[in-house]
Amino acid sequence: MAQQVEEIEQDLSHIHWSWPEAIAANPARSLATPDLAMDYFAYSPFWDAKSNNNVLRTQRRIENPAYGHAEEKVELNAFMSGFEYVVAHSQPPDLFVIHRREVESSGKRDRVTGAWFILHEKIYQCPTLFDVMSTRLKNATSLISKTLSTLSENRPPANPRTTTLWRSIPSVTSNQPDGTQPSSLDQAEKPDEGKKDDSLNGSSPLDGSDGKASPAGPDWHLFHALQATRASLVSLETLAKTPTQTTDPREELNNIEIAMDNQFGGQNQSLSGKGPNVKGGAAAVKNISVPFVPKHSAGHATSTTGLTPSIWGGSASLGVSTAAVPAREAGGSPLKWPGGDKSAPIAGATLAGQTGR
């Protein structure tokens, strides 16, 4: 029982086997047919001596030493138990696929328990699905672990003035002893201090001692500018694909007029060249001639034909009634009327109404 368990646990997937002398000894000097490939496979360590193929070879070769797979594949159908080897696929002389399948008591041979392939005269064992998935997952886990370790070692410093940037800095090799050479991470943490010290010391790119050019540091301004440009490419492409909207100036002007009419209740001046709007109608004021009014004393009432003295005080306006506005002199003081010191109101006098007189 222990020997059977050891045979089951034997794994030969890590090796491949070949025997060029055996191929050179056959009449074709190559694996020209599937029968020759099966006979070549029988010499390998992957061959199981308990198979039905080996049972037939042991019995028949006593009478026929040249007995091979060409004869045994006909007699294998007589077995109702055990397992056997068959050539499942062949592309002579380079590729052959060999299956090991179980033989049931009913004669079915559907269950495949092993697979091997012969590629360029070398025999390999096909891995199982479990082995493939396990190897791939272990490989992926190892790569992820190495990546996280590398990122943790080269983590950028926390700087509230700028965003976090992961930089790829080449390793610096020097003949200085350990502890004197600054690490690449320290250089990445202080990219501006080196520039500031160089500007204060007045150093130049050329070393004065040997005349060699010192390596220039990275241009971080250019780096940030390129990053900003790359970030705005998406919005620029969207803006370029969006068609421009054409607006009609007349329609926009009409919309402004409607909005002003709704806001001021019809008392605002029209923008389309018409006169001031009043409740009684729109009057077009083209030319207004204001006669010269001499300066009078404050003790006399002054009135120009059809015009009130409030024009000189600045209280007259287009399209707005000047009722309850005190009359003033040219000097700006209220006019004295014979009836008293009260300022005389002007009831319903508008500039538009005086132009016809």
Swiss-Prot record:
Transcription among keywords: yes
Chain intervals with Polar residues compositional bias: 160-186
Cellular localization per UniProt: Nucleus
Pfam family, one: Med6
Keyword annotations from UniProtKB, A to Z: Activator, Nucleus, Transcription, Transcription regulation
Gene Ontology BP terms: regulation of transcription by RNA polymerase II
GO molecular function per UniProt: transcription coactivator activity
Gene Ontology CC terms, in alphabetical order: core mediator complex; mediator complex
Coiled coil: none
Superkingdom of source: Eukaryota
Region Disordered: start-end pairs: 151-219, 323-357
Disulfide bridge partners, by residue number: none
Compositional bias annotation for Basic and acidic residues: 187-199
Family of the protein in this entry: Belongs to the Mediator complex subunit 6 family.
Job description of the protein: Component of the Mediator complex, a coactivator involved in the regulated transcription of nearly all RNA polymerase II-dependent genes. Mediator functions as a bridge to convey information from gene-specific regulatory proteins to the basal RNA polymerase II transcription machinery. Mediator is recruited to promoters by direct interactions with regulatory proteins and serves as a scaffold for the assembly of a functional preinitiation complex with RNA polymerase II and the general transcription factors.
Subunit structure: Component of the Mediator complex.
Protein name per the record: Mediator of RNA polymerase II transcription subunit 6
